[in-house]
Regions:
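Amphipathic alpha-helical repeat scaffolds of TPR domains
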Residues: 9-37, 64-78, 102-118
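TPR/TPR-like (Sel1-like) alpha-helical repeat modules
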Residues: 86-101, 128-129
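Helix-turn-helix repeat elements of alpha-solenoid scaffolds
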Residues: 41-53, 82-85
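Alpha-helix C-terminal capping/termination sites
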Residues: 77-81, 151
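Conserved positions within tetratricopeptide repeat
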Residues: 66, 82-89, 104-105, 158
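Terminal, low-structured helical/coil segments at or just beyond the last alpha-helical repeat
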Residues: 65, 110-194
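Alpha-helical solenoid scaffolds that mediate protein-protein interactions
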Residues: 54-57, 61, 95
Length: 194
């Protein structure tokens, strides 16, 4: 449910500026760090602090401007929970309705992340994960068409699969992988013996 702030004026402007500032901090992060490394642990702590700040601001209602909605959605998409990503998808959908460039893709990506965290197939195929051997798309719902992807600013499935196959980054230490990823690796046949 969309609950815009009932109050007008400085509070709304300050909150929008704060959300956009949090997004700038998020986008300035070096995300090319391997899971389990100290730099990754520190990154996730900063991500968590930004999400907590966003949730406090959203407690008074959703922002009314597209850029602030987009900023909040982007930060929640870096969450650890399906519910955070699902809220990010709804915020991005509203930002798209208001005409924010990039918001349709973000709504799709956040929905996919929410589904992935719930151990369900993605709708669009935006999440690429390590599988202990290489990089792959998290499972994708075969009923979703490339036309649906394109309508949401997501590349066709074959292009996303090629992107995953082209990644040559080292695999993170899978000993600390989330249980959901370890179960998926078992399903994919890539989980190394214990």
């Amino acid at each position: 449910m969309v609950r815009p702030l009932r109050r007008r004026g400085r509070l709304i402007v300050d909150r929008s500026a704060a959300l956009i500032g949090l997004l700038a901090g998020d986008q300035a992060e070096d995300r090319a760090v391997l899971a389990g490394e100290p730099a990754y642990v520190a990154l996730r702590a900063r991500d968590r602090a930004r999400r907590e700040a966003v949730m406090k601001m959203l407690a008074d209602g959703w922002p009314e401007d597209a850029d602030a909605l987009y900023a909040a959605a982007w930060i929640l998409n870096h969450g650890d929970l399906s519910e955070e990503a699902a809220l990010g998808s709804r915020l991005a959908t509203r930002a798209a309705e208001l005409g924010r460039p990039g918001a349709r893709w973000l709504a799709a990506a956040a929905l996919d992340r929410s589904l992935m965290y719930a151990e369900l197939p993605q709708k669009y195929g935006t999440n690429i994960v390590p599988d202990g051997v290489g990089w792959r798309l998290w499972d994708v719902d075969p009923a979703t068409t490339d036309q649906e992807r394109i309508a949401n600013d997501v590349p066709p499935l074959a292009e996303m699969q090629a992107r995953a196959a082209a990644i040559t980054k080292p695999q993170p230490d899978m000993a600390g992988a989330p249980d959901s990823l370890r179960r998926a690796m078992r399903r994919w046949g890539t989980l190394p013996p214990a």
